[in-house]
A protein has these predicted regions:
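Family-specific signature for flavin-dependent thymidylate synthase
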Residues: 1-211
């Protein structure tokens, strides 16, 4: 899993402050905007934070990508297994961590599977993934269309997505997906996005009390 910055609105925070002062044109060019952005956050004036956007590149797997793509306030571009050979990203499918199902919460897992048992199960998963990749390659070698051959690939297959959204959308996404109730693998991505956000929107992050 990796997250990296692709692009951001130039002078993103200053741009939001400039637009926020639309009704006070005499002060629009003021460089003292930290207090204004803090005020807007404190009083839930969120439309201001829709005026700057950020694009991130995220490398994950197809299973987690499906969760990310549900955030419809963003725009996305994803690596196409229909157009391109999946092995262009990686010819190896990483074996996932294994956690026990929480019997009281279907959307939670507990990290208490014994190491010996986990290694044994992961060995079987690795064998299954290797077989899936060999079969995928065999189908392509026989001239089967990529759009058909891809159906034999597991959800753990690596993918790459570009995720673009406003500062406001990123705040919502990071708050939601870094909280309890999010799958660990997705939470790790949200926390990595948060680190990028803190560097690119330092005043906003400080006002949100993001550590």
């Amino acid at each position: 899993m990796t997250v990296k910055l692709i692009s951001i609105t130039p002078d993103a925070e200053q741009t939001m402050a400039y637009i926020a002062r639309v009704s006070n044109p005499a002060n629009q060019d003021s460089e003292n905007y930290a207090g204004l952005l803090r005020y807007c956050i404190k009083h839930n004036h969120w439309s201001v934070f829709e005026q700057s956007s950020m694009s991130l590149e995220i490398e994950t797997n197809r299973g987690i990508a499906a969760q990310i793509l549900r955030h419809r306030s963003f725009t996305f571009q994803e690596f196409s297994q229909r157009y391109a050979d999946s092995s262009l990203l990686s010819d190896y499918i990483p074996v996932p961590d294994l956690r026990r199902q929480d019997t009281k919460n279907r959307q939670n897992s507990i990290d208490d599977i014994g190491e010996y048992e986990k290694l044994g199960l992961q060995s079987k998963i690795q064998e299954h993934f290797a077989h899936s990749m060999r079969l995928y390659k065999e189908l392509l070698d026989h001239g089967v269309a990529k759009e058909c051959a891809r159906f034999v690939l597991p959800l753990a297959t690596p993918t790459r997505i570009y995720m673009t959204g406003s500062c406001r959308s990123w705040i919502h996404y990071i708050n939601l997906r870094s909280a309890n109730g999010t799958q660990k693998e997705h939470m790790d991505i949200a926390l990595a996005c948060k680190e990028v956000f803190k560097k690119q929107f330092p005043t906003v992050a400080e006002a949100l009390e993001w550590k």
